[in-house]
């Protein structure tokens, strides 16, 4: 709808949705939900002040340099450009490629078109004479690019919104697509747009007569001329202001001349860009002039060029027709892609073997088809340079099984193949080096020759095997290597000294002993490799090893003087070098490596530092006593091994890799390789000799291979963790814009709020309004206190006014602390109370928005540039609102450092910066290409254009180059094919990116635009499939083959697309097509597998660019808790001990807060006041911090219930999230270390304790032993008070019960003023006392009295238990019919008595225990105050037990 001169703006609440059910439209801003009219701004008349606009435009166009330019220079420039065009032909599409592309796109090319270097359309017959004029006009048009760019820079949309359904697509927000209609266009006579009018093909508008056609063309020209007269209206500035801006900022093209030089030098190697330098010949004194090429590095600082990606390397990446990410990965690979057919086959098998691990195929699964898919993927990546998103979207049938339920190579698999391809090329380079090295030695070694013959197996293609070969050559052929070095360099003297000692040994007579061992290292390798004794060892017929070596020493005493007096040294030397030969044998190493990799186990061995530092709650707690961890463990939990490696680097532990039965394994290898079956003494001696050497060799091999496996395991675990990080990040990116009402799916207008630190009434509440396009409209500062009870309506009215003014469809909120939750509930209350709804009567949802991007944005350089005068909280709210519109674009606009700083995964710190960056970038690439980018919107919207670098084939440099190329066009793109015809993209990058760069189809604009625009350009259908899409449309419409053939011949197949989109029954017609049969027929005729492409075509014809992302995810429950508090399930959980600060008292409850500002409640039963029967405010102080135990967490209200009781605080519950299964956890070692640590802590505590001084006559600075020594000479009942080993809140009374018998009584102190002061409350045996004297009088003296009463009783016997037992037995024999009982002291448990008795001489002797208390004698659950009562009670108990026994016997 367009506004006429006397029309009025429609109020926002009266606006109507136009064409709600128009499903035929392709992606446009309307579908993003933008309103047609903007009530916050007024449209300006496009014809206003034309004279002023003309002045401004003239100011843009006039260029003094152009006016003063010499005509010859202009001709020279044309020639250079012509040369450049010729040199670019190699990078561009060939004529056949272009013909095919144009045919698929539905455009005919004639021979004249094919021969045109600029790929223009054919001219009409009467217009050939204007060709030269048009060509020259292009130069003038290109000079006006800078003018149009400045006009684009200052242009802004006058309308805020358009009506229309959002249609759930990716067109997140940015600028209205109508901006592109209003973009300023160059209108010089003979300009590029005038040319396009003359290049309409004959079959277009064939029914028009010449007069009608000319009138139509003139109308178009008139419209364009009018659009030029708008610069002041577009910018909203006067010409004086615009001139002033030019004076200050320039036009942004001051250095185009330098870039032009650089581009020419890169593209066509023009030698004109050279500067002469003069040099003086030192010998002759003559002056010589030399030429030096001028580059950007001669003009700018290298660091600035690197920062702006403009070094020579960057410019080369820009211009090379290979995806940028591939160029970066392949930078270190020489001669990439030139592999032999054998290496290509090996790569396919090698990569298939690695990828198949994740596919969990059955053991008998036929991998032929899978390897074919892997081979296809490798070909697409290495030969065709197609990036992962393109392969997954448009070549999926080539990377999947033909069976419906078969395998599919996922995007993860394809990215793995990309990395593995680089790894394999590096391996091939190393292999080629070793081969050249081997060839130059001019030797024939069977081991090396066999290795290179068998290199077509995947297991051979490992770097470790190749390293074995190289080490073997260095070890065995050191002399030959030295000779080769001398021959190559002409220098004498040995350079290769690595194995010089072995060479000396091999040249000595002692080496003869190695031959007498009876089997060479090569034969041992053959035996072990075949697991059979192919070459049995031969024992010396007559001599033992010692005798053989002694005979050699005697025969060569002159040459072996060092060994003559030391036979043992000679034996050790022979064993050493024989074991060295064994350890270097490649077949032995390969067999051991293969077995070790399958069956290794990993153990953790703690260092002293690790035992001390790895405690509960430590990052490495779960690996402290890890043992017997298998490869499967680490595949399931890769972070576990990475933590082991990290802890090892910190010297906390060492990771030991070993085989489960390593000793038995070594014995087995020895038996099949070196052991003879002879039983003679000589044979036994030689077996022992060989075994010692073999064990030495195996120790060395296991040491090397263990390190290799550890390195490989580290790399594989890093890949697995990186993949997990990538998936977690993809869930963040894979969110569609927030849609408040699914029945009205439009991008919402957003009001975002934050209460900052939550100091209500003191700090302002900030609100920000952002419209549907993501434009910041205004911010609000609310100074009213939302919790002011005296005038609550004031805040409510303010909020209501803001909402009525903005008419938002959704409200987003977040903040730095839990007070935001209180504010959130208040907002809900206000909206409900005042029944606030949006302009369409819908409820306005309030959601918590993820603020990790907003936190980084508010203080970023980007925010300072966008909103220099706004405070951080306003910028924070802007980012919240933008996040609701597009999480993807918010993340895409972060810098690489900011992205890496995101907390994505708990183990991302285990990855290197490069690994983390690659994982995050591939996630970006997958999601951005799922969504795609609208080309014309990206041209003048930097925020939206940030996603371009992740488009398939692009990167940071190519995205910059792409945008610059688009801006130089100075007009919107009308068709994808223009990316090729306008030389914006070359063949490979176009193929990669075209399907993910779309051009919005807008019906309103069609009558003004060139007919080159194709409706399929606004779909996910790739241009290579346009012709296929038109055939699908024709078949769906059920046209007969003759009509289809006629349209195909005329090049008007695209009409079927338009007809289908207008057909109301198109869904039923498309869904009725048998795509499987069609795909089979297509493959049979063309060899192309297109079933997935056909499915994509049908979906896109039904609903172009349907939203494929997941719904927006507002924060919920524990996510809100974590966002507002910063606490996680590992730092704040039920049972955790946390510090809390007392804020206030409520009745007898205590209100506290944690460091993260979580409000905690201590009810009256969970603090010491309940036990002491005192109010809480007498025991606890406001502002003071106390340890507390979390009892319950209320995530919804962000509160918790905690306990301050001592017994709760001392019993912290720490959940164990790892297994302590004895098979994988060293429980025995854990217990031993715990006991050792306890003893050590006790010893350290005793050594470091400060001696307390208690002002009491019985207090002595003794320990337990010293107290006993002091009392040993004292009387019974004497005592001392001393320190306790339990800590400064305990004391001990040590008192003497009898000779060498002492009791230590614990006194617990409460309510201490300081650690060394005496507590105000003292507890002994659960009884409370006020001071030490009270304990002495009421407790200790009573026990002494009762002890004396017992020892004075006739029923007490002194002496040991053995003595008393003997006395009772003797008494019972003398008096067989009498019962007997006596008490005695329990020397094992001071403070207890034995009660021993016999019923008669024939009964057994019974022993009961009696406890001495301060109130009596405790026997069988009863306390007796005197000895007499104790004896009577004992007799009563005895009679009762006897009666029960008789009753039981009777029954």
From Swiss-Prot:
UniProt biased composition (Basic residues): 76-85
Keyword Nucleus: yes
Stretches with biased composition (Basic and acidic residues): 1-12, 180-192
Residue ranges occupied by any SH2 domain in the UniProt entry: 1257-1354
Subcellular localization, as worded in the UniProt entry: Nucleus; Chromosome
Molecular functions per Gene Ontology: DNA binding; histone binding; nucleosome binding; transcription antitermination factor activity, DNA binding
Amino acid composition bias (Acidic residues), ranges on this chain: 29-51, 88-100, 153-162, 194-211
SUPFAM superfamilies assigned: Ribonuclease H-like, RuvA domain 2-like, SH2 domain, Tex N-terminal region-like
Residue segments, region Disordered: 1-217
CDD domains: SH2_Cterm_SPT6_like (cd09928), SH2_Nterm_SPT6_like (cd09918)
PROSITE patterns: SH2
Major localisation: nucleus
Protein name: Transcription elongation factor SPT6
Organism for this UniProt entry: Saccharomyces cerevisiae (strain ATCC 204508 / S288c) (Baker's yeast)
Lineage of the species this protein comes from: Eukaryota, Fungi, Dikarya, Ascomycota, Saccharomycotina
Annotated gene: SPT6
């Amino acid at each position: 709808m367009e506004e006429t001169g006397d029309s009025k703006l429609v109020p926002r609440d009266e606006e109507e949705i136009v064409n709600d059910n128009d499903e035929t439209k392709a992606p446009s801003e309307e579908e993003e939900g933008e309103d047609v009219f903007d009530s916050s701004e007024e449209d300006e008349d496009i014809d206003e002040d034309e004279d002023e606009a003309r002045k401004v435009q003239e100011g843009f166009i006039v260029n003094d340099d152009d006016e003063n330019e010499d005509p010859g220079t202009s001709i020279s420039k044309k020639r250079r450009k012509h040369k450049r065009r010729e040199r670019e032909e190699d990078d561009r599409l060939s004529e056949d490629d272009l013909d095919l592309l144009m045919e698929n796109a539905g455009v005919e090319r004639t021979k004249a078109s094919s021969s045109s270097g600029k790929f223009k359309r054919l001219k009409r017959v009467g217009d050939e004479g204007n060709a030269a004029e048009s060509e020259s006009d292009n130069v003038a048009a290109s000079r006006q690019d800078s003018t149009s760019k400045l006009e684009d820079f200052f242009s802004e949309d006058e309308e805020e919104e358009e009506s229309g359904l959002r249609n759930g697509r990716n067109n997140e927000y940015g600028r209205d697509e109508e901006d592109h209609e209003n973009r300023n266009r160059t209108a010089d006579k003979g300009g590029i747009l005038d040319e396009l009018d003359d290049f309409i093909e004959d079959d277009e508008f064939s029914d028009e007569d010449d007069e009608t056609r000319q009138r139509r063309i003139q109308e178009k020209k008139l419209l364009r001329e009018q659009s030029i007269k708008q610069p002041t209206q577009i910018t909203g500035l006067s010409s004086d202001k615009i001139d002033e801006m030019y004076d200050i900022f320039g036009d942004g093209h001051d250095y185009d001349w330098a870039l032009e030089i650089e581009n020419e030098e890169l593209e066509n190697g023009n030698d004109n860009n050279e500067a002469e330098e003069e040099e003086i010949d030192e010998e002759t004194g003559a002056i010589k002039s030399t030429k030096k090429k001028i580059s950007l590095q001669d003009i700018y600082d290298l660091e600035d060029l690197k920062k702006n990606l403009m070094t020579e390397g960057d410019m080369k990446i820009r211009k090379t027709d290979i995806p940028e990410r591939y160029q970066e990965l392949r930078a270190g690979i020489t001669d990439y892609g030139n592999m032999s057919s054998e290496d290509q086959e090996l790569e396919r098998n090698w990569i298939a073997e690695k990828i198949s691990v994740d596919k969990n195929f059955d053991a008998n699964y036929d991998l032929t088809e899978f390897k074919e898919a892997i081979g296809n993927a490798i070909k697409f990546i290495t030969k065709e340079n197609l990036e992962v998103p393109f392969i997954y979207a448009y070549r999926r049938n080539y990377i999947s099984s033909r069976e419906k339920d078969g395998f599919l190579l996922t995007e993860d698999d394809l990215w793995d193949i990309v990395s593995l391809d680089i790894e394999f090329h590096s391996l091939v380079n190393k292999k080629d080096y070793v081969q050249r090295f081997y060839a130059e030695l001019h030797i024939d070694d069977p081991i090396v020759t066999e290795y290179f013959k068998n290199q077509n197996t995947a297991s051979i293609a490992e770097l470790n095997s190749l390293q074995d070969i190289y080490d073997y050559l260095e070890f065995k052929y050191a002399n030959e290597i030295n000779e080769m070095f001398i021959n190559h360099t002409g220098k004498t003297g040995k350079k290769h000294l690595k194995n010089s000692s072995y060479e000396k040994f091999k040249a000595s007579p002692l080496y003869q002993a190695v031959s007498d061992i009876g089997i060479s290292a090569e034969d041992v390798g053959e035996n072990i490799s075949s697991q059979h004794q192919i070459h049995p060892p031969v024992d010396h017929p007559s001599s033992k090893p010692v005798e053989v070596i002694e005979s050699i020493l005697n025969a060569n005493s002159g040459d072996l003087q060092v060994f003559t007096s030391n036979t043992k040294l000679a034996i050790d030397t022979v064993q050493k070098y024989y074991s060295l030969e064994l350890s270097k044998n490649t077949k032995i190493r390969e067999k051991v490596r293969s077995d070790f990799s399958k069956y290794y186990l990993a153990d953790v061995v703690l260092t002293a530092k690790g035992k001390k530092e790895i405690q509960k709650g430590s990052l490495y707690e779960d690996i402290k006593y890890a043992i017997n961890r298998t490869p499967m463990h680490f595949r399931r939990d890769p972070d576990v091994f990475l933590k082991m490696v990290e802890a090892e680097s910190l010297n906390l532990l060492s990771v030991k890799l070993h085989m489960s039965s390593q000793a038995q394994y070594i014995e087995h290898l020895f038996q099949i390789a070196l052991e003879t079956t002879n039983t003679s003494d000589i044979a036994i001696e030689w077996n022992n000799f060989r075994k010692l050497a073999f064990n030495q060799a195996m120790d060395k091999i296991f040491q090397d291979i263990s390190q290799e496996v550890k390195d490989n395991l580290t790399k594989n675990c890093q890949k697995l963790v990186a993949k997990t990080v990538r998936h977690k990040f993809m869930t963040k990116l894979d969110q569609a814009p927030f849609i408040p009402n699914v029945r009205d799916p439009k991008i919402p207008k957003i009001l975002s709020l934050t209460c900052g630190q939550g100091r209500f009434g003191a700090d302002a509440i900030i609100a920000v309004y952002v419209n549907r396009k993501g434009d910041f409209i205004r911010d609000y500062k609310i100074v009213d206190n939302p919790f002011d009870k005296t005038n609550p309506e004031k805040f409510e009215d303010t909020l209501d006014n803001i909402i009525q003014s903005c008419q938002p469809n959704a409200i987003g909120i977040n903040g730095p602390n839990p007070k935001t939750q209180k504010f959130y509930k208040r907002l809900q209350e206000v909206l409900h109370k005042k029944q606030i709804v949006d302009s369409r009567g819908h409820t306005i949802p309030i959601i918590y928005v993820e603020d990790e991007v907003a936190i980084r944005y508010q203080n970023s350089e980007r925010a300072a540039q966008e909103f220099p005068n706004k405070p951080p909280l306003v910028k924070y709210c802007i980012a919240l609102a933008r996040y609701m519109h597009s999480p993807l674009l918010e993340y895409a606009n972060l810098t690489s450092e900011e992205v890496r700083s995101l907390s994505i995964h708990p183990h991302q710190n285990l990855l290197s910066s490069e690994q983390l960056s690659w994982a995050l970038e591939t996630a970006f690439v997958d999601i951005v290409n799922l969504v795609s980018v609208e080309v014309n919107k990206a041209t003048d919207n930097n925020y939206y254009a940030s996603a371009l670098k992740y488009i398939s084939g692009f990167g940071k440099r190519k995205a910059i180059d792409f945008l610059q190329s688009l801006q130089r066009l100075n007009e919107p793109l009308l068709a994808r094919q223009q990316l090729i015809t306008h030389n914006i993209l070359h063949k490979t990058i176009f193929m990669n990116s075209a399907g993910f760069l779309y051009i919005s189809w807008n019906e309103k604009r069609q009558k003004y635009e060139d007919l080159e625009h194709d409706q399929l350009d606004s779909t996910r259908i790739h241009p290579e499939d346009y012709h296929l899409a038109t055939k699908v449309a024709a078949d769906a419409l059920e046209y007969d083959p003759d009509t289809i053939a006629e349209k195909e011949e005329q090049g008007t197949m695209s009409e079927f697309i338009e007809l289908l989109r207008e057909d109301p029954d198109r869904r039923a017609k498309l869904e009725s097509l048998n795509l499987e049969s069609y795909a089979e027929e297509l493959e049979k005729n063309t060899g192309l597998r297109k079933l997935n492409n056909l499915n994509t075509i049908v979906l896109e014809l039904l609903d172009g660019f349907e939203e494929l992302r997941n719904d927006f995810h507002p924060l919920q429950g524990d996510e809100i808790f974590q966002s507002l508090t910063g606490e996680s399930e590992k730092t704040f959980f039920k049972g955790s001990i946390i510090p809390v600060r007392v804020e206030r008292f409520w009745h007898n409850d205590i209100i506290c807060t944690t460091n993260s500002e979580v409000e905690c409640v201590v009810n009256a039963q969970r603090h010491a006041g309940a036990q002491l029967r005192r109010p809480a405010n007498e025991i606890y102080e406001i502002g003071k911090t106390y340890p507390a135990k979390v009892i319950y967490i209320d995530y919804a209200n962000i509160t918790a219930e905690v306990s301050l009781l001592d017994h709760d605080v001392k019993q912290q519950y720490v959940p164990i999230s790892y297994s302590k299964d004895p098979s994988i956890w060293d429980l025995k070692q854990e217990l031993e270390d715990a006991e050792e640590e306890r003893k050590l802590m006790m010893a350290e505590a005793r050594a470091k304790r400060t001696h307390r001084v208690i002002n009491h006559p019985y207090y002595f600075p003794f320990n337990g032993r010293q107290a006993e020594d002091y009392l040993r000479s004292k009387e019974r009942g004497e005592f001392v008070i001393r320190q306790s080993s339990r800590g400064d809140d305990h004391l001990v009374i040590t008192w003497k019960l009898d000779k060498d018998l002492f009791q230590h009584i614990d006194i617990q102190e409460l309510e201490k003023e300081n650690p060394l002061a005496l507590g105000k409350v003292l507890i002994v045996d659960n009884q409370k006392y006020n001071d030490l004297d009270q304990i002495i009088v009421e407790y200790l003296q009573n026990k002494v009295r009762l002890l004396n009463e017992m020892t004075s009783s006739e029923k007490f016997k002194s002496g040991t238990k053995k003595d008393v037992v003997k006395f009772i037995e003797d008494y019972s024999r003398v008096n067989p019919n009498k019962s007997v009982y006596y008490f005695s002291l329990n020397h094992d448990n001071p403070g207890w008595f034995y009660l021993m008795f016999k019923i008669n001489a024939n009964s057994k002797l019974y022993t009961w225990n009696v406890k001495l208390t301060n109130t009596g004698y405790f026997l069988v659950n009863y306390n007796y105050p005197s000895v007499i009562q104790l004896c009577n009670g004992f007799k009563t108990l005895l009679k009762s037990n006897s009666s029960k026994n008789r009753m039981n016997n009777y029954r």
